[in-house]
Amino acid sequence: VIGGDECNINEHRSLVAFFNSTGFFCSGTLVNEEWVLSAAHCDSTNFQMKLGVHSKKVLNEDEQTRNPKEKFICPNKKNDEVLDKDIMLIKLDSRVSNSEHIAPLSLPSSPPSVGSVCHIMGWGSITPIKETYPDVPYCANINLLDDEVCQAGYPELLAEYRTLCAGILEGGKDTCGGDSGGPLICNGQFQGIVSYGAHPCGQSLKPGIYTKVFDYSDWIQSIIAGNTDASCPP
């Protein structure tokens, strides 16, 4: 996250850190005691998820590590289009209980409205060009913008993609490399998943692109309920 500050240790209890053999690479959001939501482009072989992390160098007493038991990506996702259905639901190999630094974030009850203030968080780069990765997550507030702003800034963003556009028009506050899969929380509701953006991060008129969680709520709830053949919206 660029243009932000170190998150308060208690304001990211649902944020999950993903690690593979090369180290930290993505985030996710705990949606209940057994399930994490992330971006499809964060799928990796043999990764672990750590919950309750603040500093990657200092262990919290209640930190928990889990492995993916099952991973679900939309069966109708166009794999050659990174922006299409960039969402992945992960079942943990065992449940996690709430603690001082761990708590789930529920799915949204309604879609967000343009103009909402949204909160971003992550261990991604805090500098736009030469990437600098912090040990602690950074947080910032940005605005939910009209989809047309992102369609103008990104010709590859098709109108039918179920995405949200969020940032600051003049630039300077944005998610960045390493923030993928983390949450966009608008007016206290979990509305987006960090999916895509410009390089360097934080350019004017090139806000971040987030998968629109609300549109996938039925799919998510179906899979959690055990209907693993559920299909995503087109």
From Swiss-Prot:
Active site: 41 (charge relay system), 86 (charge relay system), 180 (charge relay system)
EC number: 3.4.21.-
GO BP terms: modulation of process of another organism; plasma kallikrein-kinin cascade; proteolysis
Keyword S-adenosyl-L-methionine assigned: no
Keyword check for Glycoprotein: yes
A GO cellular component annotation in the UniProt record: extracellular region
Database matches in Gene3D superfamilies: Trypsin-like serine proteases
Disulfide bridge partners, by residue number: 7-139, 26-42, 74-232, 118-186, 150-165, 176-201
EC category: hydrolase
Tissues and organs where the protein is expressed, per its UniProt entry: Expressed by the venom gland.
Major localization class: secreted
Pfam families attached to this UniProt entry: Trypsin (PF00089)
Subcellular location: Secreted
Assigned keywords, A-Z: Disulfide bond, Glycoprotein, Hydrolase, Protease, Secreted, Serine protease, Toxin
Domain Peptidase S1 stretches: 1-225
Any one GO MF annotation of this record: toxin activity
Glycosylation sites recorded in the entry for this protein: 20
Miscellaneous remark of the record: Negative results: does not show a thrombin-like activity.
Entry function: Bradykinin-releasing enzyme. Releases bradykinin from bovine HMW kininogen. Has anticoagulant activity. Increases permeability of capillaries by intradermal injection into rabbits.
Subunit composition and interactions: Monomer.
Homology family: Belongs to the peptidase S1 family. Snake venom subfamily.
UniProt name for this protein: Bradykinin-releasing enzyme KR-E-1
Biological source species: Gloydius ussuriensis (Ussuri mamushi)
